[in-house]
Amino acid sequence: MESNNVVLLDFSGSSFGMRLRIALALKGIKYEAKEENLSDKSPLLLEMNPVHKKIPILIHNGKPICESLNILEYIDEVWHEKCPLLPSDPYQRSQARFWANYIDNKIYSTGRRVWSGKGEDQEEAKKEFIEIFKTLEGELGNKTYFGGDNLGFVDVALVPFTSWFYSYETCANFSIEAECRKLVVWQNCMENERVSKSLPHPHKIYDFVLELKHKLGLA
């Protein structure tokens, strides 16, 4: 493992933090992980991200980098020698950024409505959720990974949300696998040891969701 002055402020259930753990693992970067309590944010978090006051934050040589896709690009640029995530071709790179942004703009907010919603709103959220993943299946096509033959930027941006699939399905009583078989095959291709070890067990995420629903009065 390469030794660097790298700190990751994170929360174990955060899909946005998981993608950074994956990237650092793939590139063999040694780092210090600091778990944040989102109900009682640390002085370090507030100092390092005074604008948004949220995780994840990568601190490299004392300097903070915020927003997960921005951090993901930073990691790829600084440690570009091993396991490059973004393509070298400018057009392909622009497409990878487009789909990563699509993932960020769509999945988290719709997924939250899936696990927290009720009645018609939840049913509508489920339909939107499946449509999002069918759109992603269309982009994946017959490729092994979104970028082709090698695991890349879009894969790392998306795969953390699979650890939430059990929670989505259990809370809303539906099957993602039944609706999106191609995505499940892709998910199985992501059983890279460095990827899987960077993701929490789905039941741990479900326990977190139940706790969150209780706090929000949704249980």
Curated annotation (Swiss-Prot):
Single GO molecular function: glutathione transferase activity
Record bears the keyword Transferase: yes
Binding site for glutathione: S14, K41, I55, E67, S68
GO cellular component, one term: cytoplasm
Limits of the GST C-terminal domain: 89-208
Function: May play an important role in hormonal and growth regulatory responses.
Classification lineage: Eukaryota, Viridiplantae, Streptophyta, Embryophyta, Tracheophyta
Annotated InterPro entries: Glutathione-S-Trfase_C-like, Glutathione-S-Trfase_C_sf, Glutathione_S-Trfase_N, GST_C, GST_C_Tau, Omega/Tau-like, Thioredoxin-like_sf
The protein's Enzyme Commission number: 2.5.1.18
Organism the protein comes from: Nicotiana plumbaginifolia (Leadwort-leaved tobacco)
Gene of this entry: MSR-1
Induction trigger: By auxin and cytokinin.
Protein name in UniProt: Probable glutathione S-transferase MSR-1
Family annotation (Pfam families): GST_C, GST_N
Gene Ontology biological process terms from the UniProt entry: auxin-activated signaling pathway; glutathione metabolic process
Family listed: Belongs to the GST superfamily. HSP26 family.
Reactions it catalyzes: RX + glutathione = an S-substituted glutathione + a halide anion + H(+)
Residue ranges annotated for the GST N-terminal domain, each copy included: 4-83
UniProt keyword list: Auxin signaling pathway, Transferase
